[in-house]
């Protein structure tokens, strides 16, 4: 009977390869943790116009050698959806780099639902994408970053599903982060703060569609904005209060989104950095920026971080330090 249980355990384990390798994330011995954000790959499997997206992802991963890769939506833009999703995510998995995905508004328009895509992602090694029962959205998950000695949580990454299009009659445009998602964030933020003796843990958030505050910040002449802004943020018309909750909880350092292909800026707003990734896709959809990625480097025990844009040929643009580069110097 014991032998039968062992064999059954091995068989079941092999049927779930996506669950076999979910490494814990931790700061390295130098107290650093590097994240690469790819956004809006808009990959169409077999389409030559997508070749440059594969080239750039490969180049950035080989150059930066990140500890984590986050894909912030619109990974695929055509059928076959499964082959497209696997092709992109395997670029990280084949290098044994942990990765996570937050869906965009186009991912589930290619013949598969969000749930079906989520199930596919779960079968890919090194995947950290998860979901929370009872919370709206398919890709809501938390990635704690352990201290370099592995003994405690040192920072927190919140990944959220920003949904697709408005579901309210008479309200056009894009959907907003729902109240139960905000409650989920607040409850977990409070939990981590309590575990840390009452001090909020440094946190970052990643999702696809920008918050309304992006437009508010970018149009304020007193706010410091670094990078390219060639289009207004296509944010929800309604504001559900996610940014206000981030301020109340006191843990959030930066928010990183995609969706608007001609933006890659970072703007300092009320103490939080509101940033875009860099469009990563090819010519399968509109774009006026050469493709690349955003890189974020956190330091253990610090409420500051570095971020930059990585482009073709190893070029780096817009390297900044948060918050020091966004605070106006007194005369």
Tell where the protein language model's regions lie, with residue ranges.
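Bacterial Sec-dependent N-terminal signal peptides
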Residues: 1-21
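Beta-strand-turn-beta hairpins that frame and shape the catalytic cleft
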Residues: 24-35, 138-159, 267-274
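Acidic/histidine-rich helix-loop elements
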Residues: 36-54, 75-83, 109, 126, ...
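Binuclear metal-dependent phosphoesterase catalytic core
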Residues: 38, 142-146, 242-249, 263-331
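His/acidic metal-ligating clusters that form di-metal
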Residues: 64-67, 156, 171-264
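Extended active-site neighborhood of metal-dependent phosphoesterases/phosphodiesterases
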Residues: 86-198, 294-299
